[in-house]
Every structure is written in structure tokens, then in C-alpha cells.
Amino acid sequence: MKFYSFKGYSNNVGFIKFIAATAVIISHSFPLYYGNNDKEWLYRFTFGQATLGRVAVWIFFFYSGLLVTKSLMNKKNEETFFIDRLKRLFPPLLFVVVCSTFVLGPIVSNLSIEQYFSNINTWKYLLNGVFIPIHNLPGVFEKNIYPNVVNGALWTMPVELICYFVCLMMYKLKLLNEKKMPLLGIISILVILMITFIFWNLNLDVVVSAVLACLSFFTGMYVFVMRNRISIK
């Protein structure tokens, strides 16, 4: 069948996302317990080139690029596109940030309630709610391998927001079509690979992860735009 028959929430997308989420949990358990990924299954199999968690993030961003582009091109409503995206991101993000700050923090912190709420880092953590990654809560998980770190996976939120913005700009510039997408795809991949190579050599793993996530999102965009030429057996 042709890929244009893709329905978004059918085709086992939900199940695939569940598997990816499980892979993230399993993958993160290794560095949280051992302090590094040396014993993580995929990390060992690929000689340190990938982890289950990283591949799972690629899957999430791929489907995000696919579904977001589908939504934008079908509705063709630029004015509400970004607002609709924020409506999907903000409620769960704010729930996690608020619960972590005002419920989890006071319960598990080694500091007293007064010390906890008088610490500036407690309030800085709320910046996660506006897509500024701050991972530390004072006195929380101090004896862990990564002390004070809470919800480290929230780094993906601003990256996804940037991807939404790029998708919208490409739509406004009329780049999301079968004629322009292949050349644009080649150029984007070359630029992203060059950036990844530079930062990989500098050992900036977070930047590399963000760049590869963006590449996955763009791949999802590309697949949807070129859906009429893609056959699935």
C-alpha cells in the first residue's frame, strides 16, 4: 500500500511509542545505577555509538515530525498551528514541573521545608515550564550518582519546540512539497552531520543528541511530504 494511507493513530503507532518509552526507562537505568553506559545492551553491541534511549528518542522525534507535518498540511492553518502545539506540550509539562517542585521536592529533599523553598534553585527549576532546561532541585537525590538531578529527560522539550518552529517556517516558505523536499533533505542532512561531527569531536553529547533528534524529526517530515512515492509492503 502507499504511505498516504497512514492514519496517524493507527498502524500500531501507540504501541511503538510504548516500546520506545520502555526502552528509555531501561536505557537510563544503566547510567543511573552504574554511572555510565558501559553495560547498556545496545551501547555494548554498537561499541559505544548508540544506546536504547537514544534510538527511542529518534523514534519519538520521527513520529512527531510525521504527525505534526500531517496536521499542518491537512489543516493549512498557520495561525493556530503553533498554539495547538503548545496546548499539547504545556499541560503535561507544567504538571510534571509543578509536581516535581512542590510535591516531590519537599518530600524527598534532605533540606528542611524552609531551606528548600528559600533556595533560589528551587524556583529556577520552574523555568522548565517555559522550555528552559534546569535539572537540579536542592537536596533532592543527593546520594545518587547524578546528585540533585530531577527529570533530566526534559531537555527534549525545547528541542521539539524548535522543530515545530522550523516546520512552520518551511511551510510558510512553501518548502514542504515533493519537488523541493529531496534537495532540501540532502542539504539539511549534510549540515546536520557536519555539526554532529564537530560537536562529537568536542565531546558535547547533549548537543549531538539534540542534533540527531532534529534529524529524526526532519526525516519524519520528509516521509510525510514524500508519502505518495513511498510504498509499504
Model feature map: region roles:
Residues K2-F3, V68-R85:
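Membrane-helix interface linkers and caps
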Residues R44-L52, L94-L161, F165:
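Membrane-interface helix-loop-helix regions
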Residues I83-V96, Y171:
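Alpha-helical transmembrane segments of multi-pass membrane proteins
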Residues N36, E40, N74-K75, G105-Y116, ...:
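Transmembrane helix-loop junctions in multipass membrane proteins, especially transporters and channels
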Residues N11-L72, F90-L93, V97:
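Functionally critical transmembrane alpha-helices in membrane proteins and complexes, commonly lining
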Residues M1-Y9:
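Short, Lys/Arg-rich, polar N-terminal cytosolic tail immediately upstream
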Residues V13, N77-F81, L89, T156:
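Alpha-helical transmembrane segments and their helix-entry boundary regions
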Residues A21, R54-M73, T156-L176, G185-K233:
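Specific transmembrane alpha-helix
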